[in-house]
């Protein structure tokens, strides 16, 4: 999670320094902005009419904060309620991008782009076949391998590990 000061530093200062010139430069080709420094998070505005960050730092006495922006250089930053430390990013998807809310589309994108990230990425719950249909279990459905073959010692790998890695590519 972040403090209000960290939000100001990492979200606002980096984001909005030269933001107006940046937006003017890419106004006709939104897709051209992907990959530019600091725009991983800011690409969320390509599909959203509004983005909120609800966050609480691990630091002693941290106050939960909510940052909200509609994609313009204007934003709000206010105290909020959040029991646990960490950060939630909430996207309010615009009408023309509602297909990104489709479960299969999300799963496909996460699998394609997050398959080998070093932290677990959970999407939904694992399912099991029960009474003629699939039902969710209590276990998170982790879509990535946090210890892929290339980070493990060759002596620790079995033939099946290599085959799984090849299939995952």
Segments predicted by a language model, with ranges:
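GHKL (Bergerat-fold) ATPase N-terminal catalytic module, capturing the glycine-rich phosphate-binding loop
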Residues: 1-95, 99-100, 108, 115
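GHKL/Bergerat-fold ATPase module in large chromosome/replication-associated machines
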Residues: 33, 51-74, 95-97, 104-169
